[in-house]
Amino acid sequence: IKDAVAKAKAPESLVFGVVDQTPENRRPTLASLCGPAKLRYVHVSPIETRGVCWARSVAFSLYQGEDFLLQIDSHMLFEQDWDAQLIAQWTALKATCDKPILSTYPYGFEFEEGQPVVKINISDQTTLVLRPHPETALADDNATLRFRAEHVFTRTPVPGCHVAGGFLFTEGRFVDEIPYDPRLYFHGEEQSLAVRAYTHG
């Protein structure tokens, strides 16, 4: 939250919907990180939780008609003016697609001396695209495909068949049109979202 607010071009326009599944209620701490942004917060004891999809369905219930949705995992770093960049990319795609979704698996990072460090060389000539993982095959005991992010030498948008639950940016109405299935625990989450998003345009 702190990084998102610090690097946003318009932090006052941000609304965070947080479903906190830790033992202690951290609303005051998280609210103090929000600055001019708003916080909608639900605390659930880890004993009472039912998995990531259930938590994300609860997070979707915090939606109040905002223009855009950015769904991320809690382990995330942001680029400067990330909010304006996402809106600009989405707006450009809107000219060719009625309901564009920007989605990928973001770079991982590590902490060194208390500071986050991305150890991958980031190129301004490639786009990070979701592709099926080569070590994945459908089987009777495993009906879930795995995907990974790969660099493609283009800076133009690449159509995809998959969405990443840990980074998904689109119109806010996605919340109402493609609600989360709270009965899924983890596997199948992204395939369910991708198929339903496709069939809804």
Task: Briefly describe each language-model feature range.
Residues I1-G201:
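Catalytic cores of eukaryotic secretory-pathway lumenal/extracellular enzymes that build
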